[in-house]
A protein has these predicted regions:
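Intrinsically disordered or compositionally simple regulatory linkers and C-terminal tails
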Residues: 1-15, 179-215
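Generic secondary-structure transition motif, activating predominantly at the C-termini of alpha-helices
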Residues: 2, 47, 152, 156, ...
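Catalytic NTP-binding/metal-coordinating core of nucleotidyl cyclase/transferase enzymes
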Residues: 2-82, 88-89
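Acidic/proline-rich low-complexity IDRs
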Residues: 5, 41-42, 155, 160, ...
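Short, acidic Gly/Pro/Ser/Thr-rich loop/turn segments
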Residues: 28, 113, 183-185
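Low-complexity, intrinsically disordered/propeptide-like segments
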Residues: 35, 93, 155, 190-193, ...
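Catalytic beta-strand-to-alpha-helix segment of the class III nucleotidyl cyclase homology domain
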Residues: 51, 70-180
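Low-complexity, flexible helical/coil segments
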Residues: 54-60, 138-145, 173-180, 193-202, ...
């Protein structure tokens, strides 16, 4: 991944155990081809909305390229809340006749910081988690869910999607979907190497149990 902008967008980059967030617009190439020059103000609105969320939740923007963001958070709970807030901000914006859906992936772990850039498997894993999501969906690893548990409760929860194979990641990764008021919960199987296998009734029942635990 090529990063065009670094240095936290005015914020110091956190170190140690860091929560990483990757996001991008689903079908951005199709939108560009359809909208032409009208895509530029759409992209500008997208960036403005999300940058406001990152700043509100103490996120450090590591980089952006086109319609994607790479953001680091010192507290995984802030990353989880930021992902929720981002989807709410996007859903509440008037996009006219265009549908703009953003996929978000989260992972928390140790990463090396050198010359205002991160290296390590934690970064790559977060990017792969984002790539597995659908527009409007927030996926997070078990590590991020556990470390950011204080963000979860009556209004924000997770649904266990089980283990998945992600491209270039040697081991299966346990993934969760962020759930809560205002967040979509009806998505196709994840875009993973081995797609999530369940039946709709089981998935609905699992979501109901997750919400009941949150209440």
């Amino acid at each position: 991944m090529v990063i065009e902008e670094l240095a936290g967008h005015g914020r110091a980059l956190p170190s140690g155990v860091v929560a990483f967030l990757f996001s991008d617009i689903e079908g951005s190439t199709r939108l560009l081809a359809t909208l032409g020059e009208a895509y530029k103000p759409l992209l500008a609105d997208h960036r403005r909305l999300l940058r406001a969320v990152w700043a509100e939740r103490d996120g450090a923007e590591v980089g952006t390229e086109g319609d994607s963001f790479f953001v680091a958070f010192a507290r995984p709970s802030d990353a989880i809340r930021a992902a929720r807030d981002a989807q709410m901000a996007l859903a509440g914006h008037d996009w006219g006749a265009t549908s703009v859906r953003v996929r978000i992936g989260l992972h928390a772990g140790e990463a090396s910081l050198e010359d205002d850039d991160y290296t390590g498997m934690a970064v790559h894993l977060a990017a792969r988690v984002s790539a597995a999501a659908h527009g409007g969906q927030v996926l997070l690893t078990e590590a991020c869910r556990a470390l950011g548990a204080e963000a979860l409760g009556a209004t924000l929860g997770t649904m266990d999607l089980g283990p998945h194979r992600l491209k270039d990641i040697p081991d299966e990764v346990a993934l969760h979907q962020l759930t809560g008021a205002g967040l979509r919960d009806d998505f196709p199987p994840l875009r993973t190497m081995e797609r999530y296998r369940t039946n709709p009734a089981r998935a609905t029942d699992q979501l109901r149990r997750t919400r009941e635990r949150g209440e």
